[in-house]
């Protein structure tokens, strides 16, 4: 029996989780000398590297002095709540990584709470102690207070602390005494984290994540809870709905370094990948062929937001994407459901090309849209809608805990903005020059808030939020008050016409871009929508000498990210997403029909 430790890493965005794992793998000699280190091995998907967030959990294992350490990476964002709970079920302990300057952040709190509820033993790593003006001692106190407020047990509160800098590759018990490597941390993991309990009996394994290989098909990943699994063994799969199905294991793999390694037998407590099973979902149990006993399935957080997905039917349909038909989009959404547990997809009645997709928040859904866009899909999405529930006959809506960290001079602006959106301030803590303000705010109020908060604080604000509970409906919230500027006809936008319209509002297009009628090309300064002609060129006659006019001086266009577009559009608008561009448009493109619809 090999000695095993299963450990989950919990950290906030940018606190150095992925860098630390890179260094742990170096210590376990996982990279050949001279191998190109694409830093951030764990964030293997492009989107994750760009945004610095971990969306899907990864497994890596290293060998340290004869002990196998399985490192399980957890997503740090509560929008991926479904992912977090499954992953923590595989671990026996957790590594809480915090920045020596920022301290524990609100998102970390969400994952940590789940970990403490399951009863994992924590080790705290205070990272980035080499940064100027960091405050390791205070951060340690903050972590202790946080754990105490999350009802940690006495055993959990008696956690060891390791100080260090993952970037510079050292860990030590005292931040004033840098060492040369991270052996102190690895020794602590082996010493403090309990080995998995050996439970004898018939085999049981809960499937906690999926892998896919074009060669072998779907692969089930999970931790062996009881007994042993053998290569070629006959097993029964117990589904979440209670039905059972007999099948056979074709191959068993354990994690070794970055990849898999085939093995004959997997013992209790190790994490493995099972190949050759058919029809299984996350949350099913693989158990004994003769006496199947299912493990309790994992409860997944309910979705709180939904969005309309439809095929792209704009005049520029099919010019930029590879997959544009309803069949393509439908297949892609169904494929996503296999992996993405917190997602729901429902086809709109009487329409083959419209789906209502529900998820944990704007970020959760925008990551899906961005991934599809990069794969070559064209689609259109509507404004995010909050999912209401009726509880005891009262209409209720999701409420989130919102934390905004800003320089002190902007605090009053922030409080004003959030209270206008029906937020209630719950606490305000002074941290030197900055303040931490906490609110409870309806999810509706968060849509479109981030852009305004960053503008009002000159980009200084750090904002984080997580779902708390359902509460009675709080009343109407005022949305963006400015109207849209809408292109009158299809064609190429000219600098001459944009120049003449600049006093009417700000533009989302540059001269030379193609536009179509009904596309939202800018924001009007007044509340009503304005139809503008941006495709008009300058007429030249003999009277006008060609060079005497003033040159057009054009203000650069406002560039918006996908999330900003989703938060910006109104009920009668859509975002058109293609691999090369993102445009906003009216649902009814024709101006006369739109007027009629608005009147009725």
Annotate each predicted stretch with a short phrase.
Residues 30-57, 80, 146-159, 190-203, ...:
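Active-site phosphate-binding and catalytic loops of NTP-dependent enzymes
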Residues 255, 260-263, 441, 454-456, ...:
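Long insertion/accessory domains within large nucleic-acid-processing enzymes
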Residues 1-104, 142, 210-213:
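P-loop NTPase switch module centered on the Walker A-proximal segment
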Residues 148-282, 402-407, 440, 466, ...:
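Conserved catalytic-core segments of large NTP-driven translation/proteostasis enzymes
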Residues 15, 27, 31, 77-78, ...:
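Conserved nucleotide-binding/hydrolysis micro-motifs of P-loop NTPases
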Residues 300-435:
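Charged, conformationally dynamic linker/hinge segments
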Residues 94-156:
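Conserved C-terminal guanine-recognition region of P-loop GTPase G domains, centered on the G4
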Residues 225-351, 374, 556:
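Catalytic P-loop NTP-binding/switch module of NTPases
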């Amino acid at each position: 029996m090999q000695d095993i430790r299963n450990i989950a890493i919990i950290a906030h965005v940018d606190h150095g989780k992925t860098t630390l794992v890179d260094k742990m793998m170096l210590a376990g000699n996982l990279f050949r000398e001279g191998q190109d280190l694409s830093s951030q091995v764990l964030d293997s998907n492009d989107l994750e590297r760009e945004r610095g967030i971990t969306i899907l959990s990864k497994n890596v294992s290293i060998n340290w002095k004869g002990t196998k350490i399985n490192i399980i990476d957890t997503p740090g964002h509560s929008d991926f709540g479904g992912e977090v709970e499954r992953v923590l079920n595989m671990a026996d302990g957790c590594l809480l990584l915090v920045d020596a300057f920022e301290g524990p952040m609100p998102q970390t709190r969400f994952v940590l709470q789940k970990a403490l509820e399951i009863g994992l033993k924590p080790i705290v790593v205070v990272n980035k102690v080499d940064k100027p003006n960091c405050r390791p001692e205070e951060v340690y106190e903050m972590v202790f207070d946080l754990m105490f407020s999350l009802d940690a047990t006495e055993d959990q509160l008696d956690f060891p602390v390791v100080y260090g800098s993952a970037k510079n590759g050292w860990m030590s018990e005292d931040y004033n005494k840098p060492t040369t490597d991270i052996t102190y941390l690895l020794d602590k993991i082996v010493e403090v984290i309990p080995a998995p309990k050996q439970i004898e009996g018939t085999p049981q394994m809960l499937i906690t994540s999926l892998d896919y290989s074009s060669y072998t098909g779907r692969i089930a990943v999970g931790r062996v809870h009881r007994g042993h699994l053998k290569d070629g063994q006959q097993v029964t799969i117990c589904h979440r709905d209670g039905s059972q199905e007999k099948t056979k294991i074709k191959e068993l793999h354990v994690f070794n370094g970055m990849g898999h390694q085939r093995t004959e037998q997997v013992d209790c407590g190790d994490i493995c990948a099972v190949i050759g099973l058919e029809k299984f979902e996350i949350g099913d149990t693989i158990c004994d062929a003769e006496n199947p006993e299912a493990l309790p399935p994992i409860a997944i957080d309910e979705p709180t937001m939904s969005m309309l997905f439809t095929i792209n039917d704009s005049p520029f349909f099919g010019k930029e994407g590879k997959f544009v038909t309803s069949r393509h989009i439908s297949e892609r959404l169904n494929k996503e459901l296999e992996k993405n547990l917190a997602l729901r997809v429902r086809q709109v009645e009487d329409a083959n090309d419209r789906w209502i997709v529900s998820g944990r928040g704007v970020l959760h859904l925008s990551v899906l849209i961005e991934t599809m866009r990069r794969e070559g899909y064209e689609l259109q999405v509507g404004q995010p809608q909050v999912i209401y529930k009726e509880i005891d006959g009262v209409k209720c809506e999701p409420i989130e805990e919102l934390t905004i960290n800003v320089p002190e001079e902007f605090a009053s602006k922030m409080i004003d903005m959030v209270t206008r959106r029906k937020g209630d301030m719950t606490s305000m803590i002074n941290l030197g020059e900055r303040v931490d303000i906490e609110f409870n705010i309806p999810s509706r109020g968060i849509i479109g808030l981030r852009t305004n908060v960053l503008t009002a604080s000159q980009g200084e604000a750090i904002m984080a939020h997580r779902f708390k509970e359902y509460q009675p409906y709080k009343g109407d919230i005022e949305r963006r008050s400015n109207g849209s500027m809408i292109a009158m006809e299809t064609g190429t936008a000219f600098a001459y016409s944009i120049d003449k319209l600049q006093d009417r509002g700000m533009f989302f297009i540059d001269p030379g871009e193609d536009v179509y009628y009904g596309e939202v090309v800018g924001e009007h300064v007044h509340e009503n929508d304005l139809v503008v002609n941006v495709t008009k060129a300058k007429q030249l006659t003999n009277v006008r000498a060609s060079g005497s006019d003033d040159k057009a001086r054009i203000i650069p266009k406002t560039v918006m990210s996908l999330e900003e577009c989703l938060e910006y559009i109104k009920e009668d608008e859509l975002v058109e997403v293609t691999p090369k561009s993102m445009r906003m448009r009216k649902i009814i493109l024709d101006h006369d029909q739109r007027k009629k619809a608005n009147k009725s």
